[in-house]
Structures are given as C-alpha cells and as structure tokens.
Curated annotation (Swiss-Prot):
Domain of life assignment: Eukaryota
GO CC annotations on file: extracellular space; lysosome; membrane; nucleoplasm
Gene3D superfamilies: alpha/beta hydrolase
Function: Has dual calcium-independent phospholipase and O-acyltransferase activities with a potential role in glycerophospholipid homeostasis and remodeling of acyl groups of lipophilic alcohols present in acidic cellular compartments. Catalyzes hydrolysis of the ester bond of the fatty acyl group attached at sn-1 or sn-2 position of phospholipids (phospholipase A1 or A2 activity) and transfer it to the hydroxyl group at the first carbon of lipophilic alcohols (O-acyltransferase activity).
Protein name as it appears in the record: Lysosomal phospholipase A and acyltransferase
Leader peptide range in chain numbering: 1-31
C-alpha cells in the first residue's frame, strides 16, 4: 500500500525524522507502487444465487433457499442429476422484445466481492486447486508489497452477459479507479485476462482521453481474444465440457448458448478471412459470413439476435488510449476449425492451429493494429508454450508484470 498522508507534510518534519521515515518506508525512495485492478475473464469469478422458484426440473433440486449460495464454482453442483438443477439456475432467458436477458423465474444472481480479490483468486470458495485462478498472481503482488482489498482489488462481473447489459458494473469500476487514485496518489494499472480484456477495452473506449491520461497508468492484457475465438462455434453448436469428464457437452450446451457473451466472442471479420471455413458438415460449411444460417441450422435463432446486439460493442480500430502490454501464449494446439459427421449434436473432429489452447494467435495479435494509432506505446510479449489459464502463473508473465509495476 502506498504511504497515506499524515496531518503534516513530510517537508515540514525535522530532517532526522524525515531520514528515519525514508529508511522505514522504502516506497518513499522508490516511488509509489501503482494501485492494481484485476479484471477476470469468462467464468473467471464466483457467482452467488438465491432461490424462490415456482417449479424445479427435478425433485432433487432446491426450490427455495434462505440465503445466497455459491452458484459458480461449486463442484458439488456439477454431479449427475444435480447438474440439471444448476443449469436451470445459471442459464439466462433472452427476451426478444427487449433484446436483453433476465434471470429465470425465482432466481436471483449476484456477483460477490467487488473490490476484493477472493472471488477471482479461487472460483471455488473451498479453495480447491481445480478452482485456482488469479491466486498465484495475487500472492506475487502481496510479496511485492501490495495489500489485498486495498491497493490490489478485483473487479468481478456477471460474465454471462456482454458489456451492454452490465452498465452498473462500469460505473462502479470507474468510481473504484478514481477512489484508488485518490487513496494511493497515482494512476491505476489494469490487469485483465481473456474476455476481461474485451470488457476493459469496451470501458476504455468510452472514457474521455483526459480521464484516461489522469487515472490509467497502463493496461496489461493477458490472453486477449481481440478478434474473437474459433472454438466459440463448437461451443454453440455442440457444447464444450472443457475436458470435465462428468459433464456431457450436450448437457452444458443450453447454459453456454444462453450466455450472450458466448455469441459476442465469435470470430470477427477484421481478424479472419471471410473465406475461412470454421465448421465443416456433410451438408454445409460455415464461414463468418454464414452466422445467420449457422444459428438457424443449430436450432438457436436467438443466437443471431444476440450476435447482432453485441457485434459492434467494441470498435476494432479504436485503440484503448493508454499504454498497452499484450501478453499472449503461443505453441499450444488451439482449436481452429471443426469437422462434423453428424451436426450439431455430436462432438466434431478438431483441426488445431497456433495459440494458447483457447485464444487463436491471430486474435491475440490483433493489438498490433493499434501501433501508430495511439500516442501511447503498444508492447507485445509472446509466452511460448503458455496455456490460456496457466499464463496467469507463468514466471515470464509475473516478471513482466513486476517490471510494469515496480520498474526494472
């Protein structure tokens, strides 16, 4: 934590006391540590729910709860049969008239821990290794002198929704950044991962340049899907269990489709060729020009509306307007296109390309296009062999972040 000002300016202290104060607090000699805000990615922070439902999908499902419980991540809710209860609670309901989502009847979902780090350090409150996310990075920040909930804070959000439905979140984020600036005497470093980078870019593109110059020191982007992600088509078509064996892809597909953020992350034409075939089937092939037909053929017409609602949220050629550090994984086989023998209800064969296992390399490299389009520096750092989640604990990542925060 940076030094807070006492009732007397340091310059008025007797020389001996000032010398002792400098010895006691090396931060005064080295300069203030910039406060840090962490923005997680898709699935990247806890969600809590409270129930008072008119009906349930199975007699084993809870109909009513007295208090909020952990909806994500709670591994006990992903067991066979019980997972049906979980899907019915965590899904969103799309309203075609309002072009917005709502919670299912009798379900209230909230995001715990805004301004804290616990919600994104461990996705599972039991702190199981399966749910470890930002923990190693936060531990490193603490080792460098930071204090949880003070000069390093988390900015969790409802990652099921795209930014256009999370307006209050961005107001709270701006207020927190301004508060940290006042408390710690300098601009903030934003550290985002995965879809959190798209959220951060959306936020920065809507702030005045004078505000960004004052309040933002740097933006560190880890594994950013600037141009969308190819695997999103597989998620929408046949579901993706993320290699969790107890979950069948078709079982989880309903929840994944209902999250508007899924359609938001489909590949964009400013990164991929309009001729590239992402999905091959016996009767049709699909490029990014075929999304309308794709959604028709998978039986999810609302998905096309969701895509139309979100496609223009982030402007590809409008840079963030702050010093940007893009760190991205390479050399990890990453889903690039999909071959279906039976479409869409069977798992496809996958053709792999370069990337971090989730984000395709060409999408991560999209930040290169901002060089020369903003006065601030745009730096790129490859992380060879670094997987999408593992990069948060990667030694190169942490050393790079330390240099950004504390200097060489």
């Amino acid at each position: 934590m940076g030094l807070r000002r006492g009732p007397c300016p340091a310059a008025l202290l007797p020389g001996g006391f000032l010398f002792l104060l400098l010895l006691a607090d090396p931060a005064l000699l080295a300069g203030r540590r910039p406060p840090v805000v962490l923005v997680p990615g898709d699935l990247g922070n806890q969600l809590e729910a409270k129930l008072d439902k008119p009906t349930v999908v199975h007699y084993l499902c809870s109909k009513r709860t007295e208090s909020y419980f952990t909806l994500w991540l709670n591994l006990e809710l992903l067991l066979p049969v019980i997972i049906d209860c979980w899907i019915d609670n965590i899904r969103l309901v799309y309203n075609r008239t309002s072009r917005a989502t709502q919670f299912p009847d009798g379900v209230d979902v909230r995001v715990p821990g805004f301004g804290k780090t616990f919600s994104l350090e461990f996705l599972d409150p039991s702190k199981s290794s399966v749910g470890s996310y930002f923990h190693t990075m936060v531990e490193s920040l603490v080792d460098w002198g930071y204090i949880r909930g003070e000069d390093v804070r988390g900015a969790p959000y409802d990652w099921r929704r795209a930014p256009n439905e999370n307006g209050p979140y961005f107001l709270a984020l701006r207020e927190m950044i301004e508060e940290m600036y006042q408390l710690y005497g300098g601009p903030v470093v934003l550290v985002a991962h995965s879809m959190g980078n798209m959220y951060t870019l959306y936020f920065l593109q809507r702030q005045p340049q004078a505000w960004k110059n004052k309040y933002i020191q740097a933006f560190v982007a880890l594994g950013a899907p600037w141009g969308g992600v190819a695997k999103t088509l597989r998620v929408l078509a046949s579901g993706d269990n993320n290699r969790i064996p107890v979950i069948r892809p078709l079982k989880i597909r309903e929840q994944q489709r209902s999250a508007v953020s899924t359609s938001w992350l489909l590949p964009y034409n400013y990164t991929w060729s309009p001729e590239k075939i992402f999905v091959h089937t016996p009767t049709a092939n699909y490029t990014l020009r075929d999304y309308h037909q794709f959604f028709q053929d998978i039986g999810f017409k609302d998905g096309w509306l969701m895509r139309q609602d979100t496609e223009g949220l982030v402007e590809a050629m409008v840079p963030p307007g702050v010093p940007l550090h893009c760190l991205y994984g390479t050399g990890v086989p990453t889903p690039d296109s999909f071959y279906y023998e039976s479409f869409p209800d069977r798992d496809p064969k996958i053709c792999f390309g370069d990337g971090d296992g989730t984000v395709n390399l060409q999408s991560a490299l999209q930040c290169q296009a901002w060089r020369g389009h903003q006065e601030h520096q745009v730096s790129l750092q490859a992380l060879p062999g670094s997987e999408h989640i593992e990069m948060l604990a990667n030694a190169t990542t942490l050393a790079y972040l330390k240099r950004v925060l504390l200097g060489p």
